[in-house]
């Protein structure tokens, strides 16, 4: 019988740890964890996402600051705000909501955030720390960090002897996910759109992570019996059964058929998704502990 991972439940337990750690830090050192979120322009999806991040930060007991800037904000103005937040000791995490409206260039903005405040884990310094196995001072990108919580809950801390395949090589997810698996001693293969015999490569995986943005691409015959399958894809597909023009969310894995083969699987929605915001909160409270010279909590 397959185990379907309840992402909402595990995210809630992460948030519980964040709340306890936030309160303990305040009690021991008088430091209130601070998160600043910057949003530029009026994209409704971005505003909804930022709203949920800010609400969650307040729920965790953080000082939560939201900077809403007009679409015509210049590169210099945005860079200036980041510099101000970098210099503010009451802010431990800085998040710039992407994508930025054109013609703003997000890359120099992201790289200008102090690595110790880069709670999205997107700076080249944090990417480099992960690549060299430094998980003590770096911050890890939230979605792979969340997916890794699932892997550890199923397989433990040490993945020695297990084969892991990550489909997707993005800087945002695929590469950091592979590094995390490698740091835990898994034997890791990164597959992608140019990989030959992709199904065959996937069939060797004890842990299969799909992050390519192709609806239900991973079929049952790609999966080793009993494997752990982590589905990071979020795809909208037509759902005529719901009515004309309606859509539904599916992952990169054909959930129903793969559930017959896998040992453990994450659903879409309700799997990796809820973990992303939870791990953002985790990174922020970790950053606050480090800034205060305290030992950060483990997730």
From Swiss-Prot:
GO molecular function, one term: methylenetetrahydrofolate dehydrogenase (NADP+) activity
UniProt GO cellular component terms: cytosol
Quaternary data: Homodimer.
Similarity comment: family membership: Belongs to the tetrahydrofolate dehydrogenase/cyclohydrolase family.
PANTHER family reported for this sequence: C-1-TETRAHYDROFOLATE SYNTHASE, CYTOPLASMIC, C-1-TETRAHYDROFOLATE SYNTHASE, CYTOPLASMIC-RELATED
Function: Catalyzes the oxidation of 5,10-methylenetetrahydrofolate to 5,10-methenyltetrahydrofolate and then the hydrolysis of 5,10-methenyltetrahydrofolate to 10-formyltetrahydrofolate.
PROSITE patterns associated with the record: THF_DHG_CYH_2
Name this polypeptide is given: Bifunctional protein FolD 2
Any Pfam family hit: THF_DHG_CYH
Recorded name of the encoding gene: folD2
Keyword set, alphabetical order: Amino-acid biosynthesis, Histidine biosynthesis, Hydrolase, Methionine biosynthesis, Multifunctional enzyme, NADP, One-carbon metabolism, Oxidoreductase, Plasmid, Purine biosynthesis
Record field: transmembrane: none
Organism encoding this protein: Rhizobium etli (strain ATCC 51251 / DSM 11541 / JCM 21823 / NBRC 15573 / CFN 42)
One annotated GO biological process: tetrahydrofolate interconversion
């Amino acid at each position: 019988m397959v185990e379907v991972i309840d992402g909402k439940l595990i995210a809630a337990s992460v948030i519980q740890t964040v709340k306890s750690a936030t309160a303990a830090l305040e009690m021991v050192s008088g430091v209130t964890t601070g998160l600043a979120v910057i949003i530029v322009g009026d994209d409704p999806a971005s505003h909804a996402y930022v709203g949920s991040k800010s609400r969650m930060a307040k729920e965790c007991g953080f000082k939560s600051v939201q900077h809403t800037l007009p679409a015509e904000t210049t590169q210099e103005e945005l860079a200036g705000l980041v510099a101000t937040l970098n210099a503010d000791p009451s802010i431990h995490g800085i998040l710039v909501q992407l994508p930025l409206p054109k013609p703003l260039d997000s890359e120099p903005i992201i790289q200008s955030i102090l690595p110790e405040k880069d709670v999205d884990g997107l700076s080249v310094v944090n990417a480099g720390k992960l690549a060299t196995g430094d998980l003590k001072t770096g911050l890890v990108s939230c979605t792979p960090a969340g997916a890794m919580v699932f892997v550890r809950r199923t397989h433990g801390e040490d993945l020695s002897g297990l084969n892991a395949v990550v489909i997707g090589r993005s800087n945002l997810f695929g590469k950091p996910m592979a590094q995390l698996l490698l740091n835990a001693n898994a034997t890791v293969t990164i597959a992608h759109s140019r990989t030959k015999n992709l199904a065959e490569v996937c069939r060797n995986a004890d842990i299969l992570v799909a992050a390519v943005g192709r609806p239900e691409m991973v079929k049952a015959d790609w999966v080793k019996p009993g494997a752990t399958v982590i589905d990071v894809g979020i795809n909208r597909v037509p759902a005529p059964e719901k009515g004309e023009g309606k859509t539904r969310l599916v992952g990169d894995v054909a959930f129903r058929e793969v559930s017959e083969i896998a040992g453990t699987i994450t659903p879409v929605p309700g799997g990796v998704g809820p973990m992303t915001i939870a791990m953002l909160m985790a990174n922020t409270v970790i950053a606050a502990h480090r800034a205060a010279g305290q030992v950060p909590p483990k997730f």
